[in-house]
Design a protein with these regions (language model features):
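N-terminal secretory signal peptides that target proteins for export/translocation
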Residues: 1-15
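Bacterial N-terminal signal peptides
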Residues: 17-31
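Extracellular ligand-binding/catalytic regions of CAZymes and related secreted enzymes
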Residues: 36-50, 68-69, 79-80, 250-349
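Helical hinge/lid and interdomain linker segments adjacent to catalytic or ligand-binding clefts
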Residues: 41-44, 56-58, 62-155
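Residue-level preference for short coil/turn positions at secondary-structure junctions
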Residues: 50-51, 113-114, 141, 213, ...
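An acidic, glycine-rich "communication" segment
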Residues: 51-52, 148-255, 319-349
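Hydrophobic residues at beta-strand termini and immediately following loops
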Residues: 88, 245, 286
Length: 349
């Protein structure tokens, strides 16, 4: 009998601990499920860590699996760096499932109204005006933008389109918006594959001039290797700061030698933008950024550092900050038609 109170006490202790864990898990899940009902994810940092900055990450590409990479980046930004994040997806309105091949619907863009940063990795989207207006208003306000990989050709409107935002299309050649969103805002539109797509990777080489100038975005970043190939660039980027050059590699592994027959191309840069009637804003663009590319720690650090820089927190960038994925991250190889079918936003919590 003398041992029963101790046993009861231990059982009570662990029961209370389990109830607390269950409650916290339920509370965290509930906040995200509420967001998921509207087809996007919403992550909030702990109060002690919060930066007071909101970031909207926009996926929606058919090939490079941004529906995998952006939730991972959002969790790093929230749990490791104190940013509040929203992750948006291409959603099929009939199934309510994530469908990168459905090009006309990305719910949740209204979250840009009070966001501090937009990170976009979309490809060839033809969004309705009621969604595009939120992107346009964000840019008119001169707020910062980070473009990843296919964001250079994020939008595509056919010639017969009646959209008020047709000029965002990657092939536009009219007025100020030559090259559309990519050409006018990010610095380049879609040109070509400079490297051999699917057989050559990219070695990202730091620009020594920018390192010498102590560019905060490059703090702690070393050479990057990714399996996606180098994109071609035609724009001189004369008003940009080139941070990283990409050299094609003869193979799809980090040990592959460089292809000395091919020139280097800019693969990461910063610049300013200003749309007609809008305020001036700043941009970080990298043509790297498939989901499998983000297995490279240095690329993750580059993007996290760029996020700090974009929202004016460059003085808080640390060379050894934690940029490890939160939980398991097992991206699949890029390719058309390879996305995992039947997924909902909540599946990427």
């Amino acid at each position: 009998m003398t041992h029963q109170p101790r046993t009861t006490s231990i059982l009570s202790f662990w029961t209370n601990k389990l109830l607390l864990i269950a409650f916290l898990s339920f509370s965290f899940g509930l906040s995200n499920c509420i967001a998921q009902q509207n087809n996007w994810l919403h992550f909030t940092p702990e109060k002690a860590q919060a930066k007071g900055k909101k970031v909207v990450l926009i996926s929606g590409d058919e090939e490079y699996r941004s529906e995998e990479s952006l939730p991972m980046l959002a969790k790093i930004l929230t749990q490791k760096h104190g940013f509040e994040t929203f992750v948006l997806f291409a959603i099929n309105p009939e199934t309510k499932q994530i469908d990168p091949e459905y090009q006309k619907n990305i719910p949740g863009l209204e979250n840009l109204q009070n966001a501090d940063l937009m990170i976009i990795a979309s490809r060839f989207r033809e969004l309705p005006d009621e969604q595009m207006k939120h992107v346009d208003n964000f840019l008119k306000a001169g707020k910062p933008v980070i473009g990843l990989r296919t964001a250079t050709h994020a939008f595509n409107f056919p010639k017969e389109s009646k959209s008020a935002y047709k000029h965002y299309g990657f092939s536009n050649q009219e007025g100020d918006w030559k090259g559309g969103f990519g050409g006018f805002i990010l610095g380049e539109t879609w040109i070509n594959h400079h490297g051999d797509h699917g057989t050559e990777g990219s070695l990202g080489l730091m620009n020594g001039l920018q390192i010498n100038a102590k560019n905060p975005i490059l703090l702690g970043v070393e050479d990057i290797w990714v399996p996606s190939d180098v994109y071609g660039i035609k724009n001189s980027l004369k008003n940009s700061e080139i941070l990283v050059f990409g050299q094609p590699t003869l193979g799809m592994t980090a040990e592959s030698p460089i292809n000395r027959k091919k020139s280097i191309m800019p693969v990461a840069w910063t610049k300013d933008y200003q749309i007609p009637g809008g305020k001036k804003g700043k941009v970080f663009t990298t043509t790297m950024g498939s989901s499998i590319d983000l297995l490279d720690k240095n690329l993750r650090r580059l993007i996290v550092n760029a996020s700090y820089w974009a929202v004016g927190l460059e003085n808080e960038i640390k060379a050894d900050s934690n940029v490890d994925p939160v939980g398991e991250f097992k991206p699949i190889m890029f390719g058309f038609g390879t996305h995992v079918k039947g997924k909902y936003p909540k599946d990427y919590l």
